[in-house]
Amino acid sequence: MSLFSLLFALFSCQAQDKGFESLPVEAFKRAIADTTVVRLDVRTAEEFAEGHIEKAINIDVLKSDFEQEATSILPKDMVIAVNCRSGKRSKKAAGILVKNGYKVIELDSGYNGWVKEGN
């Protein structure tokens, strides 16, 4: 088995263990085109105001009441598509949401990657 194959297999297992899928920009874009997907931006209000994915809800994952606010607003019968600036905070938020019974996808490269690819 090549090193690349081994790393790919390890990464795939880790993603499954987290309970959510991290998607590249194009796959995320296709996923959020579905009207049954809720778009969640977990950056600060200031970052969100500078630009965001259309129709996204903003709940700052760094706020102490993120979990309470998210679970009171987000529907559990829909997929939650999470993004942040670069992918770190969205992974944290995705983990919290999965723990609370949500089905989650996450934009691996964040809003920066989204913009970089011309969106």
Features from the language model and the residues they span:
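Structural scaffold elements adjacent to functional motifs in cytosolic proteins
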Residues: R39-D41
